[in-house]
């Protein structure tokens, strides 16, 4: 990969993965000398004002949340036509991949993971933020066995209408009934997905 620096600060190292809205890279923060993850909005969405607003909203929403079970967001920016979010770099595997590799979890582990996700959602809900896409792929299991909720990409502040467009966003197997009907969402929508 060609060396690229975003915002005059974040040196992209290698691609970690690609999702529905963005590609994630491991990067080096050249100011604070630490490894970070940088989510770069996919080019096909960069010209779409709604997606750009949603991307910025994710950064703002997640940056205001403080929990040991939520991935930390450090920065947001635009470099030319590239929108990016800088966040905590996590080592581990997403819950879905972990279950595929190692099989079903024992009930004690399920309870621990459920409790930690609930704690993360409680923090988000106290800030009136609804995740809207709780699913195993958005739960990172760390080497110590704890989890972090990731990808607030379609999260929305409960009182925000900035990106409300009556589109159904979320993953079919996990969305709440009210989400499929395009109705107003609340904390119970995330709990249903959990």
Role assignments for model-derived ranges:
Residues 80-94, 98:
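Conserved short submotifs of the Hanks-type protein kinase catalytic core
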Residues 190:
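Conserved catalytic-loop aspartate of Hanks-type protein kinases
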Residues 12-19, 24:
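Protein kinase glycine-rich loop
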Residues 113-114:
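Activation segment signature within eukaryotic-like protein kinase domains
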Residues 40-64:
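AlphaC helix of the eukaryotic protein kinase fold
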